[in-house]
Regions:
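Conserved PLP-enzyme active-site core in the AAT-like
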Residues: 2-34, 38-55, 61, 70-94, ...
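Flexible glycine/proline-rich, aromatic-decorated loop/lid segments
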Residues: 137-140, 269, 274-277, 297, ...
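Short glycine/threonine-rich loop-to-helix capping motif typified by GTGT followed
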Residues: 192, 346-361, 390-396, 448-455
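Phosphate/diphosphate-binding loops
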Residues: 256-258, 362-369, 373-374
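Short amphipathic alpha-helical segments
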Residues: 263, 343, 401-405
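Short, conserved charged micro-motifs
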Residues: 275-276, 354-362, 410-419
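PLP-dependent enzyme catalytic core of the Aspartate aminotransferase-like
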Residues: 309, 373, 385-457
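Conserved glycine-rich beta-strand-loop-beta hairpin in the small C-terminal domain of fold type I
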Residues: 322-323, 337-349
């Protein structure tokens, strides 16, 4: 008999969870203006809002924290981190930042000017926000297959080479760089193939452009290359990562995802001119170059986390849990972005709440219903997150409207996955009774989903 799969870790410490009543949750979400970001953590039973900074660290990471060097300049923990990053990516120049959006802010302050065009694959919210706040334009070049949530394609996060080439052929002089998000979060945590990274590199070289990877989940991307792309099944995760980054000129990183830490980020590049340009913005925005907004102990934990997560057993355990949840939804017939991604399951709200018009934000409505049902907090990745068009100020309804259920790393058991799936099934079973959604009563100009105020219709 073949032995079943089991996690690659055991539990040393636990945190109690609090259940609540349906009446409590109905009151709490109303007080939060129907914005799940405004809920207090003790009002949540299972938190699937994000996988960013919500994971559990290993005993090795905690041990490394005790050895953290808090020197303002020349911290030994920085050089330990730099050595690890260079070993995994091949990038020589490293600037730490307090998280991923800070890395974008520092690097884009150097590279993105008003009127610039930045093509890529479904820029995530902070990436798009940092581009558009500089009066520049993010152009989505994701493959069209990503728009069909029921289509089984192994690399739905890919850049469409024809779309990318068209942008460069027409407006190359306005393009400071190409950005590739690995994995493609907005499209459902979908991976980018190694072949596609080669194609992007070739197009970039043709037009003399550089390539940045938004690398928050680069280890998950490497795992999918190993399991889905021919020629990589016998490669280690570290070998695949090294090849992936060979097709890039630099990276921004939110270490709160695949770095397995609660806070941190960095910029890494092979180009001295990018490093020198970013330095000028790191010091006033983040801090000195050898800490950049991070404590020494956090840099030490990050170095260990990067090394741990680029081992097959660690990343496989993480992705197998997400696949377990997907299998439960398959059993219940609930539609989601297929195949399931690495960090989250993205429920197709347009296919679930078919009676709720897009103008009333089906994914946000589904997120509210799931919270009321069982205290499970998800996150809308759809029409609210898309913000308004910066020119017309109209809502952007052209993309997908998804409920993202992120799974924190090394935190929940499969019993929790069963609860999430059962709660979704309960909502799905009464989907035809849900005919109205929400309306916006207050919003900010950029990244409105964090603070938007809504009313239930």
């Amino acid at each position: 008999m073949e032995l079943p799969f089991a996690e690659s870790w055991k539990i040393k410490m636990v945190e109690p969870l609090r259940k609540s009543t349906r009446e409590d949750r109905e009151q709490w979400i109303k007080e939060a203006d129907y914005n799940l970001f405004q809920l207090k953590s003790d009002q949540v039973y299972i938190d699937c809002l994000t996988d960013s900074g919500t994971g559990a660290m290993s005993d090795r990471q905690w041990a490394a924290m005790m050895m953290g060097d808090e020197s303002y300049a020349g911290s030994a923990s920085f050089f330990q981190l730099k050595e690890t990053i260079t070993k995994i990516t091949g990038f020589e120049y490293v600037i730490p930042t307090h998280q991923g959006r800070a890395a974008e802010n520092v690097l884009f302050s150097h590279l993105v000017k008003a009127g610039a065009i930045v093509p890529g694959n479904s820029h995530f919210d902070t990436t798009k926000g940092h581009i558009e706040s500089r009066k520049a334009f993010a152009v989505d070049c994701t493959v069209d297959e990503a728009k069909d949530t029921q289509l089984e394609v192994p690399f739905k996060g890919n850049v469409d080479p024809k779309k990318l080439e068209k942008v460069l052929a027409e407006q190359a002089e306005l393009v400071p760089f190409i950005i590739v998000t690995i994995t493609n979060n907005t499209a459902g945590g979908q991976p980018v193939s190694m072949q596609n990274l080669r194609e992007v590199r070739a197009i970039a070289d043709k037009y003399g452009k550089r390539v940045i990877f938004d690398s928050a989940r680069f280890v998950e991307n490497a795992y999918f290359i190993r399991t889905r792309e021919e020629g990589y099944a016998d490669k280690t995760i570290k070998e695949i990562c090294k090849e992936m980054f060979s097709y890039a000129d630099g990276m921004t990183m939110s270490s709160k995802k695949d770095g397995l830490v609660n806070m941190g980020g960095f910029i890494a590049t092979r180009h001295e001119d990018w490093y020198e340009g970013a330095k000028k913005f790191c010091i006033p925005f983040e801090g000195f170059l050898t800490y950049g907004g991070m404590n020494g102990r956090d840099m030490a934990a990050l170095a260990v986390g990067l090394d741990e997560n680029t081992e097959l057993e660690t990343i496989e355990t993480r992705i197998r849990q997400v696949q377990y949840l997907a299998a439960k939804l398959d059993e219940y017939g609930i539609p989601y972005q297929r195949p399931v991604g690495g960090h989250a399951l993205f429920v197709d709200a347009d296919r679930v709440l078919t009676n709720v018009p897009k103008e009333e934000f089906p994914a946000q409505t589904l997120a509210i219903e799931l919270y009321i049902e069982a205290g499970v907090r998800g996150c809308e990745i759809g029409y609210i997150l898309a913000d308004r068009d910066p020119v017309t100020r109209e809502n952007r309804f052209g993309g997908l409207d998804l409920l993202r259920l992120c799974i924190a790393r090394r935190v929940y058991t499969n019993n929790h996955m069963d609860v999430i799936a059962a709660a979704l099934k309960n909502v799905y079973d009464r989907r035809n009774e849900i005919k109205r959604g929400v309306k916006i009563v207050w919003e900010t100009e950029l990244m409105r989903h964090f603070t938007v105020k809504l009313e239930r219709l």
